[in-house]
């Protein structure tokens, strides 16, 4: 039986392979640690980060409770959508980075969908 880490890595590589086929759009990449959530919009053709948001930002960090929860994921999603809109990005590819589309990842994606299409 495979360990959880191997399943995660396999899922991550499968997602990245599918995303690499759509190289004409920017990539919304998500990373989640035990304490924080990070979101970046990356241009893979130029290898640069266009916009970034996380629970470490001063606007989101004001709440002293747990940083990695659904409420903060919604705030990060809205913040990354606002930064993408100001940068003129309307359409991205969602890279969930091997995480299952559930809970915190789903909340962040739904909040980002208000201004970004993916």
Curated annotation (Swiss-Prot):
Alphabetical GO CC annotations of the entry are:
cytosolic large ribosomal subunit
Q: Does the keyword RNA-binding apply?
A: yes
Question: Cell wall biogenesis/degradation: is it a keyword of this entry?
Answer: no
> Known InterPro entries for this protein?
Ribosomal_uL18_bac-type (IPR004389), Ribosomal_uL18_bac/euk (IPR005484)
UniProt keyword terms in alphabetical order: Ribonucleoprotein, Ribosomal protein, RNA-binding, rRNA-binding
CDD domains to which the protein is assigned, alphabetical: Ribosomal_L18_L5e
| GO terms (BP aspect) | translation
Recall the GO molecular function terms of this protein's record. Answer: 5S rRNA binding; structural constituent of ribosome
Q: Which family, according to the similarity comment? A: Belongs to the universal ribosomal protein uL18 family.
Fill in the subunit field for this protein: Part of the 50S ribosomal subunit; part of the 5S rRNA/L5/L18/L25 subcomplex. Contacts the 5S and 23S rRNAs.
Function in brief? This is one of the proteins that bind and probably mediate the attachment of the 5S RNA into the large ribosomal subunit, where it forms part of the central protuberance.
List the HAMAP family hit by this protein, alphabetically.
Ribosomal_uL18_B
NCBIfam families reported for this sequence: L18_bact (TIGR00060)
* The protein's name in its UniProt record: Large ribosomal subunit protein uL18
Origin organism is Rickettsia prowazekii (strain Madrid E)
